Amino acid sequence: ILKSYSGLGKNIECLAAAQAITELTFLLVGNNDKQQNYLSCVLAHLDRIYLYEESKEEDIKMLSMSIQSLIHLLAIGGINLPIHHCCKTGEPIIPPLGNWEWSCYYLPSEGFSSIEDPQSNLKINASEVALLQRLLFPELPIKSNGELLGPKKVWLKILFIIETWISAQLEKELSSLKMLREIYS
């Protein structure tokens, strides 16, 4: 045994986050399928979850770590959330931070559109799009004061996007994401 993650069950949040990684891995990687960098990404995210220290205050860091891990694994698995380009026009999506009039529309089977679409089931603002785009980076989006960017309601909105994207693209739902939603709602 090279690594053991026996402590992942220390709380329900960590367990659900680790289970989400496992469930998505089963869906994305076949038995003989060799995904470049997939295992190292899984291990890096499991390490992060394993090393997580729970705080006494309401903490959404585990939720954000789980969401980011799934975004990374979806990208490596070839079904990345297409958050950088409009699915209707192909134009880059560059959220104008501070412009509260600007919005983007999420379509679970296509991606994000800068053009309003009747099939869209979610409207997101510029700061939410920018946060979602930052989740592709290795580190969590942390403010200069050390706090996580975005309130809980935004992270739950991003969780909804991940849930519906996985469901639309892989035609399966992850039970662990329902668990995370229940824990943080």
Regions found by a protein language model. Name each.
Residues 1-185:
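Non-catalytic alpha-helical scaffolds and adjoining flexible linkers that form interface surfaces
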